[in-house]
Structure formats: C-alpha cells, structure tokens
Design a protein with these regions (language model features):
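Short amphipathic alpha-helix that is part of the acyltransferase structural core
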Residues: 1-25, 35, 40-43
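Conserved beta-strand in the GNAT
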Residues: 37, 42-60
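A short, internal acetyl-CoA/4′-phosphopantetheine-binding micro-motif in the GNAT/acyltransferase core
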Residues: 59-67
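Conserved acetyl-CoA-binding loop-helix of GNAT-fold acetyltransferases
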Residues: 67-80
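Conserved GNAT acetyl-CoA-binding A-motif
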Residues: 82-96
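Conserved catalytic-core motifs of GNAT/GCN5-like acyltransferases
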Residues: 94, 104, 109-124
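PLD-like (HKD) phosphodiesterase/transphosphatidyltransferase domain
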Residues: 134-205
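HKD (HxKxxxxD) catalytic microenvironment of the phospholipase D
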Residues: 231-276
Length: 294
C-alpha cells in the first residue's frame, strides 16, 4: 500500500508537474532501494528513496506542503538511516539546480558541473551524515571561482540556481533577444518564480531597441503577466547580454552556448549594477507594451 502511495506522489510531482517522461521516472533501482514516506497525520505529503550505495533521490513533496519543512525532514530521516543502519560515510544525490539552496541549507556540498537529467539541469551534491558543509562551491559571496558555462544546460542551470538563492534584485540586459536562454521554458520559469515569490522582488529587463512583434517575446509576455514586479525598458546603451543578481551573482553571455559566471566577485557585480541600474530608470517603455497597457 505504501508503494502505491509513493507512486502517486512521484506521478504528481515528477510526471505531471515537471513533465518527466514516465519511462525515465520508473526504473529497476526502485526494487533495491529503501523508500521513505512523509506523513502529516495520516496524509502522505512526500517521499524519497535511498540506495545501498548511499545515493538518494526521487525526493518529492506535494506542492501544497512545500512550505512546511518536509524536505528537510526527509533529508534528516535519510541521514539517520544511512548513518545507523547502512553504516555509510557519505550520502549523495543528483539535485535539480533550483533546489541547490535547499541542499546547502541542509549542509550539503556541491560539485561544480551541470548536467541534464530528464530535460532538467542538475548538480551532484554530497554530505557526510551528521557533518556540516565543508566546501564553498556555489556558495554566494564565498565562492570566488570564475565559471565557464559551455552549453544550454549549464546556462539554464546557473539561472535557475542563482534566482533560487533570492538575490535582492535581478537585472537582465538583453542585447540579443534571440538568445536561446531567454526562450528556454525552465529559465523563464525561474524568472517567474523569483518575481512572484515576494512583493519586494523586482526584475528589471533592458533591451537595446524595439522590433516588430516584440510583445510576443517570452520575456515581454512574462512582464505582461507580472507587470508590478517586472519592468522592461529600452536603451540604446545596452550592448551586453548579462544576468545580474546582486550583490554577488553575475552571468555574462558571450555566445549562444557559452557564458562566464561568478558569485563571489562583488566589485565586478557592483560595477555592472552601476552601469545598468540607471538605465532601468531612464530607459523608455516599449511602445507595444504601452499599447497593451491601455
């Protein structure tokens, strides 16, 4: 019976919500894994599985219960079982990029290197059960590395991860409106989640000029849906393609498949903010956007 309940949770979260193909969701590892089921009273709210090797995954919490700390409770249960029953020294997982702040909060270390799993950007995370975080990879303000991102998965993963870290604001300077990042559903959803997550958050989008049909661009359509949180301005001074997530995050897009990123160079981020933030105030609203607002 518990297996059926777990199956329903995974179907709801992974297959229906995240659009993971069913043939990728179900595998032979389910037979050998230890399965965890989180209950609120008698109501199932989440699940996870742990392999004998110490790798865990398929961790899911139903949408309506995600602000109730069930993810951390599942992690604690996995750690306890791995430590006392399996007697293993390390647990590992392939974490979705947007969930990295959650794993860091729970003491996990992150391995640099984004990869695709079922069409979703992931990173490997690991932890010695009961031990604190021991490295600063992808830790805002502490990680001084400069990262070269060499494919769309990495560019999207960085965008998802950085916006999930709740920066004070996000500035998107978009000199090339055809760049694949800003047509990617996962990247756009990360922008939407960030903007919708708090009434204090703001996304400021800058474009160099207007073009016919600009209101059909995904960024403009997103702005129309969240006009109180997202603004678009036109300025001929926009010559770069960057995502600034102050006070510590910066992604500079150098081509369609490449970008340079940092989350520890505060002076560089401050310089880029000083360059682009005034343009978000002095730039003009797109004419098509003004017509739509009438």
């Amino acid at each position: 019976a518990s297996r059926d309940v777990i199956r329903k949770i995974r179907e709801e979260v992974f297959i229906k919500e995240q659009h993971v193909p069913p043939e990728l969701e179900w595998d032979s590892h389910d037979i050998e894994a230890v399965h965890f089921l989180a209950l609120e009273g008698r109501n199932p709210v989440g699940c996870a599985r742990l392999m004998p090797s110490g790798k865990f995954g398929r961790m899911a919490v139903l949408r309506e219960h995600r602000s109730h700390n069930w993810g951390s409770r599942l992690i604690n249960a996995i750690e306890d079982y791995a430590r006392h029953e399996l007697k293993i020294r390390e647990i590992r997982a392939a974490a979705q990029a947007h969930a990295i702040p959650f794993y860091q909060k729970n003491g996990f270390n992150v391995e640099a290197g984004f990869f695709d799993d079922a069409g979703i950007a992931h990173l490997n995370v690991y932890k010695a059960p009961g031990a604190p975080e021991t490295n600063y990879v992808f830790n805002p303000g502490r990680d001084s590395n400069l990262y070269s991102l060499d494919d769309v998965t990495s560019l999207v993963g960085w965008t998802e991860m950085m916006l999930a870290m709740r920066p004070r604001r996000a500035i998107i300077a978009c000199s090339d409106l055809h760049h694949p990042l800003w047509w990617n559903h996962a990247a756009l959803d990360a922008v939407r989640r960030f903007a919708a997550g708090s009434h204090r958050r703001r996304v400021k989008i800058l474009i160099p000029s207007e073009m016919g049909g600009i209101n059909r661009h995904p960024l403009l359509r997103l702005q129309q849906r969240l006009s109180s949180r997202i603004s678009v301005r036109v300025s001929a001074e926009v010559r770069d393609d960057v995502l600034i997530t102050g006070p510590w995050g910066l992604l500079e897009l150098t081509s369609e498949m490449h970008g340079i990123a940092t989350m520890g160079d505060a002076s560089r981020v401050k310089k880029m903010e000083a360059l682009y933030l005034p343009l978000t105030e002095t730039g003009q609203r797109p004419k098509e956007a003004r017509r739509l607002a009438l």
